[in-house]
Amino acid sequence: MSSQQRSKKKNNSRLYILIAAALLLVVMIVLIAVKCSGGKKNPNTDSTSGEASSQPLEAADIDPLTGLSGFKAQGKRPIAVVINNSNPARPQWGLCTPDIVVEGVTEAGITRMLWLYSDINKIPDKVGSLRSARHDFVEIAEGLDAIFVHWGGSKYAYSAISDRGVDDLDGRSYMGRYFFRDKERTNVAIEHRGYTTREAIDKGLTKLDIRRDIKSGYQKPFAFVSESSPRTPSGGACSNIDIVFSSYCNHSFTYSAQDGLYLNNINGAPMTDADGKQMAVKNVIILYCPVSLMGDSSGCVDMDLTGGSGVYLSNGAYENITWKKGGPHDMLKLYSSDGSELKLNPGKSYIGIVPSEKEARTVIA
């Protein structure tokens, strides 16, 4: 081999060494970079992460009871007001103002209502007529961490309030200060004339130093679709539903396609407030549950609020649902037939807790 060939071979060897060293350096840099990043993929290039990040987050101003935007009282406790629904108490003051109206039977088949407000500022200048508490309504309010407003109560209701430390404002204790008797409805008994006001409730909560912020770990009670993406229940069309609580009280809700709401009729006549406005809601929710007597001379009933079946109506259609509450502290939850949490259309709701024995008398048309 000539000296020229030996020199060329030597130069080639040096070149190979340099190339190998460079490649080794690149590999080391890559390994160090991966180690420092924890071996995680770049979320900006991961298609799965990209899909997840594109999911819209719930806006901070969504009302927990209606699902409507523009809510200004985030973090505040709802207010639950017990309302009289016997014949002499109608028409009620403020009937069309609650976010949710819950109705259930009491003694002798008479129904009582629980009006739920997500914000104290939604309560009108006059709300009533107020009535005494029943333990089932205490449990519903308790599950929502709501402040409970009532005028008197059964012994079972007072036991529930006392034993479980439910925050309440009671007209029996504060008549003339935060609770009043209407002076114009002189044609009905005095127990049908009780009312309160937004200002009076506000003053009462301040005087009694009642907690106004929701408790730690609080979860919103209901799921809603967005206002821009309304849903139609999957069970079929429903322009009207008839429900029966007892021989004393029955309702029908008739769908108005013009405004997308269900109009409430009670005992064959429009259910209107003191100003003549008919109650109308976006969502009608019927829950069936066993109802039994407490077994004493009081005539009080007990609604088994463990859970059961029901019907959901909205946008002119219906579907079968299930529901669950469980214990007194537990929140009422609604589920679709497939077991997923029921998603409501944003708007006001009516929840009727109907005795199971009356389920067969429900008529959907």
Please tell me what each predicted stretch does:
Residues 1-15:
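N-terminal Lys/Arg-rich, disordered targeting/topogenic segments
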Residues 30-43:
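Hydrophobic single-pass membrane-insertion segments
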Residues 19-31:
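Hydrophobic membrane-insertion alpha-helices, especially the h-region
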Residues 47-98, 107-365:
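A surface/extracellular/periplasmic glyco- and lipid-processing/surface-interacting theme
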